[in-house]
Design a protein with these regions (language model features):
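Short loop/turn motifs that connect adjacent beta-strands in outer-membrane beta-barrel proteins
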Residues: 229-235, 268-274, 310-318, 354-364, ...
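Outer-membrane beta-barrel translocator domains and adjoining extracellular loop/strand segments
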Residues: 248-258, 285-293, 329-338, 375-383, ...
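Surface-exposed extracellular loop regions of Gram-negative outer-membrane beta-barrel proteins
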Residues: 312-327, 364-370, 429-436, 440, ...
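Periplasmic polypeptide-binding modules associated with outer-membrane biogenesis and secretion
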Residues: 4-211, 223, 240-257, 418-419
Length: 555
């Protein structure tokens, strides 16, 4: 194994601890905005014609003057049928819809048309007249109404504004919201009708073999979330992981255990959230021959604040700022000392973007981390307890990115996932290092095998999905092939650390999923199995085979 530890421990606790325990955010519910249906011309409209001298459009938006003029110019000075007049009104309406003004209607008002006379069209600035929330569970009804209140009566409203408010209304933990738009009673008025279901509690339970051999390979994991119990959109959650032997959890000898709690708390109705979270993990790896057994401790407190800068069906751009305090230390069992001790504070700034493009889905994340201070080399020298990495310092800087892309795939899916990190040439604490392994990189190696200060990974997959169905729901069986390459560097390595690491893997796998309980996969479960072949320049990891298994159920 190649980690930042010179003492031979297979993996530090921070390397098997996820960066967050917060439940993933599900997709928005069905958002349906009816496109303009268009005016219906009267009977025999194609047989009635009139010579038009001029066309006036009342109530038009200045930003649509060019599009409007392009349509009306085709009518001026010509003999046109009544059907052509109605078609022109519909064309102007479609031009407004194309610019996002989907509630605008263009009318042909009652008028007496004479040969050589003018034609009058009227643009009606549509608006949301009211929101019908009777189909929303009562406890969440007031919050949904509050998040949509800014739409009511607003003129010049665009599709992007409507989508943002609807997605915010659906962003209530446990709520699955669908919406439709219908014509209201007032001229230009629109009625927004909402239907929703709400799950007050959600959770997952599963197992996998992502851990290294020194930690027993297998782990059991579970998570539980309480969704908006007070009706303010809050979420309280907890997560736990442990080694495969449950009997050892209570006598503190399990190879790995993780506990964490947190809360997602909305502030206001425009998408601002704060997320305090505490995580504690412990590893008790199998001892290296000739060395005493040791135990690693890692704890972390995070306070995150996030805000959606752009929020539509086509794009979600979110900014997040995080303050984090972390401590990690490794102690030999039976000795009153530490092998290393890291304590530091860090601020992180993150931009995360999700795009839905005609050819597929594209997501990117940029993170900049700046150390704010903590235990450094001076304290290490005074206490005779070193840091996890020689040369590391608590005011570090690092930058990372991740760009997963996935094509739209009714049957054949293609995915490309790239990740990278730079530490600007300086060593990092183990908890801040970059992983070259894992399910989204060189998956022939378990978590914690390769941790570096700077590096990059690239993984490609091709998957063929075979849907199947039954009376209660649907599922998919998806075989896939993959290939991955990773490169990394340890800045200022010790004599026992490789300065440069490369790792590649390729193989085949199978994923199964169901959206409802089945005889094979209960509770809407997911199951995956993968056979991977790996290559590396690290001694002992040159050529390996690995089978990866993961199973999870959600409720």
């Amino acid at each position: 194994m190649a980690t930042g530890l010179a003492n031979g421990q297979a993996v530090a606790p921070s390397r098997v601890t996820p960066s967050t325990l917060a439940p993933p955010v599900g997709p928005a519910g069905a958002i349906t905005v009816t496109s303009p249906a268009g005016l219906t011309p009267p009977q025999n409209a194609s047989n009635l014609s009139v010579a038009i001298s001029n066309v006036t459009v009342e109530g038009g938006f200045p930003e649509l003057e060019a599009e409007t003029e392009a349509v009306t110019a085709k009518l001026r000075g010509r003999r046109v049928t009544v059907a052509e007049i109605f078609a022109a009104a519909n064309a102007i309406e479609q031009a407004y819809a194309a610019r996002g003004y989907v509630l605008v209607r263009v009318a042909v008002p009652p008028q007496q048309l004479k040969n050589g006379g003018p034609l009058r069209l009227v643009v009606v600035d549509g608006f949301v007249e009211s929101v019908d929330v009777k189909g929303v569970p009562e406890r969440q009804r007031a919050l949904v109404q509050a998040r949509l209140a800014s739409l009511i009566g607003k003129r010049h409203v665009t599709l992007a504004e409507i989508e943002r408010r609807l997605i915010l209304a659906s962003d209530i933990p446990g709520l699955v919201l669908s919406s439709t738009i219908a014509r209201g009673t007032a001229p230009g008025g629109t009625l927004l009708v909402l239907e929703a279901t709400w799950s007050p509690i959600a959770g997952t339970f599963g197992f996998d073999n992502r851990l290294p051999p020194s930690l027993g390979n297998w782990e059991l994991n579970g998570a539980l979330a309480v969704n908006s119990p007070l009706g303010y959109g809050e979420q309280l959650y907890g997560a736990a992981s442990t080694g495969y032997n449950l009997g050892k959890v209570f006598d503190a000898t399990t190879p790995m255990q993780l506990l964490g709690v947190g809360a997602v708390l909305p502030l206001g109705v425009d998408g601002l959230k704060i997320n305090p979270e505490y995580t504690n993990s412990v590893t008790r790896p199998a001892p290296v021959p000739g060395a005493p057994p040791d135990v690693g401790y890692y704890q972390r407190f995070d306070l995150r604040a996030s805000y959606p800068l752009i929020l539509t069906r086509a794009q979600a751009l979110t900014f997040q700022a995080t303050y984090e305090w972390a401590q990690e230390h490794l102690s030999p069992i039976g000795f009153d000392t530490d092998i290393y001790d890291d304590q530091y504070n860090v601020a992180r700034l993150q931009l995360e973007d999700h795009l839905r493009l005609p050819y597929g889905l594209l997501a990117g994340t940029l993170v900049f981390s700046q150390g704010l201070g903590g235990r450094g080399e001076t304290q290490a020298a005074l206490t005779n307890v070193p840091l996890s990495q020689q040369g590391a310092f608590p005011t570090f800087s690092k930058s990372g990115s991740m760009q997963p892309g996935r094509s739209l795939c009714p049957t054949i899916c293609r995915a490309l996932i790239g990740q990278a990190q730079t530490s600007f040439g300086h060593p990092l604490f183990i908890a801040e290092q970059f992983s070259l392994d894992g399910s989204q990189a060189a998956s022939a190696y378990p978590l914690g095998t390769f941790s570096v200060d700077e590096g990059a990974t690239l993984r490609g997959e091709i998957q063929r999905a075979y849907p199947f169905g039954w009376t209660q729901g649907r599922g998919t069986i998806a075989p896939y092939i993959f290939g991955a390459a990773s490169q990394g560097w340890i800045d200022d390595p010790t004599a026992v650390q490789p300065g440069h690491i490369n790792a590649e893997s390729f193989g085949v796998g199978l994923r199964l999923g169901a959206d409802t309980p089945t005889p094979v996969l209960p509770l809407g479960a997911t199951f995956s199995i993968e056979l991977a072949r790996g290559f590396s320049n690290v001694v002992g990891e040159g050529q390996v085979y690995r089978g990866n298994v993961a199973f999870a159920v959600k409720f």
